[in-house]
Amino acid sequence: MSEQKKSSKIIGIDLGTTNSCVSVMEGGQAKVIVSSEGTRTTPSIVAFKGNETLVGIPAKRQAVTNPAKTLASTKRFIGRKYSEVESEIKTVPYQVASGSNGDVVFPIDGKQFTPEEIGAQVLIKMKETAEAYLGEPVTEAVITVPAYFNDSQRASTKDAGRIAGLDVKRIIPEPTAAALAYGIDKAGDKKIAVFDLGGGTFDISILEIGDGVFEVLSTNGDTHLGGDDFDEVIIKWMIEEFQKQEGIDLSKDNMALQRLKDAAEKAKIELSGMSSTEINQPFITMDANGPKHLTLTLTRAHFEKLASNLIERTKAPCQKALADAKLAASDIDDVLLVGGMSRMPAVQEVVKSIFGKEPNKGVNPDEVVAIGAAIQGGVLGGEVKDVLLLDVIPLSLGIETLGGVMTPLVERNTTIPTQKKQIFSTAADNQPAVTIVVLQGERPMAKDNKEIGRFDLTDIPPAPRGHPQIEVTFDIDANGILHVSAKDAASGREQKIRIEASSGLKEDEIQRMINDAEKNKEEDKKRREASDVRNEADSMIFRAEKAISDYKENIPESLTKEIEERIEKVRSALKEDAPTEKIKEASDELSRHMQKIGEAMQSQSASAAANAQDGPNINTEDLKKHSFSTKPPTGNSSSSANNENIEEADVEIVDKPND
């Protein structure tokens, strides 16, 4: 069959704040897929440079010189309103603005990008990594999210998957995925805690596992706590120290800030294995006296002091999770560490103090979540048998009722999928309509919780206050995404909605973004093809000039002149930035003329064979080896005065060695 078949594999993607990772089930085992750059994780960074969109390592490499157009840690903004991200905005060098309906947007070059679009670019990179490995198109995925992500953030992540061209079969919490990876081959019943401190969020989940059943008992966390915050305390310290030394405030210099961010991240990582680290940033800035260099020493003890408040913030969620699970710390059999920040020795000490045991360091904190996502993909695809995952919702869901009160319908840590119904009524006589305001959170008053949606139930028949019977149904699917309906018993009139992300992405906007992503993919492909044609033309010029130089005595002067003319045509096309077709045409013409070198030399060899006494001594067997290729050399080619291998048109030119 010539038609390329789509993969039956459901890939697992850990869409992280700092790094992302993709995995797939192979032969009953989850395998992390290495990227085209040769890495097992990819930076979750997207940059815009001219007409190019860079993702991953290429985006990270140019961040220092292009901080305003390099978007990192955008996961901290997904599914959130501008009013909710005040602390996050202060930590990024790029512009964050409020969209038309209060959404977070990133203005760049006159366009406004949403966090979903940026997340989609990272997911496209993960998708392409999997496709390159599997050798077939991939359309289905399981994507992980922090356990403490609310409904809006989960729905936004699913939308990002759709924009990337993926059918998101399941959204699962990161700690749950880690538990799957850890417990898939474990025998016996165990209660485990998953302590997940990543780049942007902190989660703690308590699970019971046994006989292939993974049941989440409780979850808690802080979506405003992660590795970025630890970087920030180092950056703040560096700025203060430099100001003391030089009297210069680096906080207003975006390029310097990006360099400090990179230095802070490097120092943080090094201090997990060393007691101190040197921070050297030459030419960080300059004043009237010349360039200034930043040179500092940061000890592990001082870093722990700087970050002590952040580490302390992990304690309360752990204690709440244990209380919600109705367990004592001594009931926990194993504690898994997930997320890069869990490598910090002070963090591990806190985990030990909370749970009274050494945490398990047997899983790779950077890869275990993607591995778990791939296992869940295997479960959904039928490749993994006898595994049942019972997850929970992290926060209570309810509606606003009379007096601005939050009335919960589904309590936090309820196992999903689930459906809950409750009867409500009107607050005034002959009330023709009710507005259902859907809330998520744990506070008693509606205004203190997060509004995740609202809709109206209209045309209620006139009746005294309290008489109409309005049945409100909350239906939560396996992704933890909420569907709400309200039905008037008297009229049978019903209104239902799927709670959209608070980012406010409507279906037509998602479709536009899907089309934009596809269009960008095509444009990127064209740009790559154009670049390949230019590079090939440039190589062709080099090879043609080398062939003329090396074999000038063996080919007619007229042919040399023809080839030189064609070389100039290609060079002019490149210099004038001619269309790709014109460059290719000129390059192909040069290629055809280069083949004439072989023909001329074979003709000369025939003549030489007929009159060996009169002409130069040319071995016809050697000439049979002469050939020319339009392709660049492959493998290792050696070159010397006596022995030279040039690949030029499906034929290799080999000079006869001088004995």
From Swiss-Prot:
Q: Which InterPro entries match?
A: ATPase_NBD, Chaperone_DnaK, Heat_shock_70_CS, HSP70_C_sf, HSP70_peptide-bd_sf, Hsp_70_fam
Top-level taxon of origin: Bacteria
List-wise, which residues carry Phosphothreonine?
Answer: 201
Instruction: Show the ranges annotated as biased composition (Basic and acidic residues).
Output: 571-592
| UniProt keyword list | ATP-binding, Chaperone, Nucleotide-binding, Phosphoprotein, Stress response
Q: What PANTHER family does the entry give?
A: HEAT SHOCK PROTEIN 70KDA
This protein is called what? Chaperone protein DnaK
Q: Which organism is it from?
A: Chlamydia abortus (strain DSM 27085 / S26/3) (Chlamydophila abortus)
